A protein has these predicted regions:
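Conserved beta-strand/loop scaffold segments within soluble protein domains that form the structured core
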Residues: 1-164, 168-171, 185, 192, ...
Length: 214
């Protein structure tokens, strides 16, 4: 089951992001699923090292961050594939407005004797103002040859063509932007497997997006 950690709000079934350990070891056949959420008004640093130590282990890390004013948010993630036949996935999406600062530092390390590895990392961001800044640094360090690994990062703005289309369908501009932002963040929310918890988190995210200045 996915564990959800939140900064800036709470919901039944979630945990404060401050309770997330800074280092987690994953043994053979074990699976860890974590979703980390940072909402407007919360500044935080999230250092996390995952040691994947046993064959058949799987790690899924997802997160979203919504910054609207002067928040400072940093994700510093290190995933170490210390055993063969292991899998890791990372998906982090963020929105920054005002004069906020966000950073995603993601590092995947595959040891030389760790073969048959699958490791994937994505970080996508949207800026809402000229003063907001997002730093993204995805990194792969691969010392084995039998691997399937990828990483990628994007930073941009809300899609004006999509807004134009929605406005042509009678959707007000402000609502079109809100819908775009929610859609952008929804792949992270969708990682939550419990339907009731997913709905509660989706409501928090929608409220947070509607509080932003577009």
């Amino acid at each position: 089951m996915v564990k959800v950690f939140i900064a800036g709000a709470s919901a039944p079934g979630t945990y404060p992001i401050s309770e997330l350990p800074s280092r987690i070891r994953v043994g053979a056949g074990e699976s860890i699923d974590i979703v980390a959420i940072v909402l407007p008004g919360a500044s935080c640093e999230m250092p996390l090292t995952m040691d994947i130590d046993g064959e058949g282990a799987e790690v899924n890390l997802s997160g979203l961050y919504i910054c609207g004013s002067e928040e400072k948010v940093t994700f510093d993630l290190n995933v170490h594939h210390n055993a063969g036949g292991t899998v890791s996935r990372q998906l982090f999406n963020g929105i920054a407005g005002g004069s906020s600062r966000a950073a995603f530092h993601g590092r995947i390390v595959v040891r030389q004797d760790s073969q048959k590895i699958k490791a994937f990392q994505e970080n996508h961001n949207i800026l809402l103002s000229e003063d907001a800044r997002i730093e993204t640094m995805p990194q792969l360090e691969i010392y084995a040859d039998d691997v399937e690994c990828s990483h990628g990062a994007t930073t941009g703005f809300l899609n004006a063509e999509e807004q134009f289309y929605m406005r042509s369908r009678g959707i007000p501009e402000a609502e079109a932007k809100v819908m775009q932002a929610i859609s952008f963040l929804s792949p992270v929310v969708a990682r939550i497997d419990d339907e009731e918890l997913r709905g509660a988190v989706a409501a928090l995210v929608e409220d947070a997006v509607r509080s932003l200045s577009f």
